[in-house]
UniProtKB/Swiss-Prot annotation:
Name this polypeptide is given: Nucleoid-associated protein SYO3AOP1_1366
Subunit comment: Homodimer.
Organism: Sulfurihydrogenibium sp. (strain YO3AOP1)
Gene Ontology cellular-component terms listed: bacterial nucleoid; cytosol
Known role: Binds to DNA and alters its conformation. May be involved in regulation of gene expression, nucleoid organization and DNA protection.
């Protein structure tokens, strides 16, 4: 026989998880991740969701001869800040859902 008490408890837990995930999203929007590459020549700042908020480039890289170096550093910085934001998201989701970090990377929540 079906136990409606268990269903009610499950629905309550689901609502709690949803609220925790929404709170985590807000916290991630306010999180700042800073990455510096090339000895600080390029700096990228993103929020915890991976949106790039700021980019600083050493003026010595802003000449035509340094373009290949600048391009490589920008790619490295953006990729690193993206990877770090994924780690921050996984941690926040793990905290919000109670799931282990490797299980909290399920698709599309953020």
């Amino acid at each position: 026989m079906f136990n409606f008490g268990n269903l009610a408890e499950l629905m309550k837990q689901a609502q709690s998880i949803k609220e925790n995930v929404e709170k985590a999203k807000e916290e991630l929007k306010n999180e700042k991740i800073v990455v510096e590459v090339g000895g600080g020549m390029v700096k990228v700042v993103s929020d915890g969701l991976g949106t790039v908020l700021d980019l600083e480039i050493d003026k010595s890289l802003l000449n035509e001869n340094e373009y290949p170096v600048l391009k490589d550093l920008l790619i490295a910085a953006i990729n690193e800040v993206s990877e770090r934001s994924k780690e921050v998201v996984a941690d926040k989701i793990s905290q919000a859902t109670g799931l282990p970090m490797n299980m909290s990377k399920f698709g599309g929540m953020f």
